[in-house]
Amino acid sequence: MSVFYTNIQLAGDTILYRGIKHGEPVQFRCNFSPTLYVLSNKEEEFKTLSGKNVTPMTFETAKKAREFIQQYDGVEGFEVHGYERFVYQWIRREFPGEIDYNINQMKIFALDIEVQSENGFPNVDEAAEEMLSITIKDMVTKKYYSWATREFTPPEGVEAFIFWTENEMLNHFLGWWAQNTPDILTGWNINLYDVPYIARRVNRVLGEKWMKSLSPWGRANEREVYVQGRKNYAYDISGINILDYFDLYRKFTYTNQESYRLDHIAFVELGQRKIDHSEYENFKDFYTRDWQKFMEYNIQDVELIDRLEDKMKLLELAITMSYDAKTNFEDVYSQVRMWDTMIYNYLTDRKVVVPPKKIREKDAKYAGAYVKEPKPGLYDWVVSFDLNSLYPHLIMQYNISPETLIDERHPRATVDRILEETLDIDGDCCVCANGAQYRKDIHGFLPEMMQSIYNERTIYKKRMLNACLLYTSPSPRDRTRSRMPSSA
């Protein structure tokens, strides 16, 4: 039976752990002692990127480790190596190998709320309008749960809880939530609407203590998020991964849509529209005159999220990426954090420590990629080339990596001289168009990583194409060929 984490936080000096053990949810607190490395004159197990020996220093608490880093920051000749995002040190220590996870053992909820609109669209900032209903779909068991402030006939498969006041509804919802806390919460724009509205409304109606009970650790923190210059509110609910399907769709699909409303995206991807209520004058008229249809409208939103996931597997993609990198699920939105952690794990496997973190102010502009200026005119036989995984291949081609970079730039390198093949290049180095030079006598860790990831991508791309051929080709011969093992 497998053991895997679902969420790990570092609160002060304490690890807050949630995960699955042998199919059952587990949750605990524990202390953590981070490890850093300093230069050593003796032969040691771990080395720096440049090959220097380093010795480990284990600290009693994360606070003491941070104080040590600050104490020697800027001290000439004293280097403190090691990954400073300590929570990922703990993950690696507890899960050193490949993580054997099972999505079907997690609690993954799709959430949608409906709110009164007595004075236009409800304002999250004030959370002054009463909540009318809450619907959750467990995307693993496929069960529905609806809380409502009026009676309705629940569709088949929906467990309904009916109350006469918002206060009663919220009390029951929070009690149920505490007994069924999800590992992942999703929905459409829940990060900037549903979750902050619930949190602010509960805080307003029941008090801060009840609001913080949304978190299994009693930790729910508000933060400001600016979107196109407009201030929004989001909540970090400790222990729960909020993976907004709206954000996942924007990040992992590569076509621009004319609208990102759920109604439009569901039509584009599923051929289905949300329940139409245009016969009513406004939203208030809708829930006042046809409560049954209104609740079906609420329930349909979480059903659409589940159908989108069945087709697109964006949650599954985020989960897979997170376990590959050994990060939390929400980290998929941060490319820097994902890559930093992947590099940390890759180097640690090879007994190499992460170099000291350098903070630089961006006070200068950097030249972008070279773009050849087109010459206007009429041309025959025009072709277009799309290079496969261009940036990774450039990194591999030029052996681009921190430890292979040479301090001196090539004195005569320019784009034009390289294109005209008039530049003399010493065979000991790779020379880039901007004059940067990279050693060739050692293989950099970054191109090694790129090659490994690209090889895996090639294997799974072929498997995907074979699967597509199997299900779309009418030819028995093609179907037979698709079952043949890939040579990759």
Describe the function of each predicted region:
Residues 144-147, 154-160, 164, 181, ...:
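Active-site-proximal helix-loop-helix substrate-binding element of RNase H-like nuclease domains
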Residues 125-128, 196-209, 397-404:
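Short secondary-structure boundary/capping segments
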Residues 3-10, 14-44, 95-184:
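Conserved RNase H-like, two-metal-ion catalytic cores of nucleic-acid enzymes
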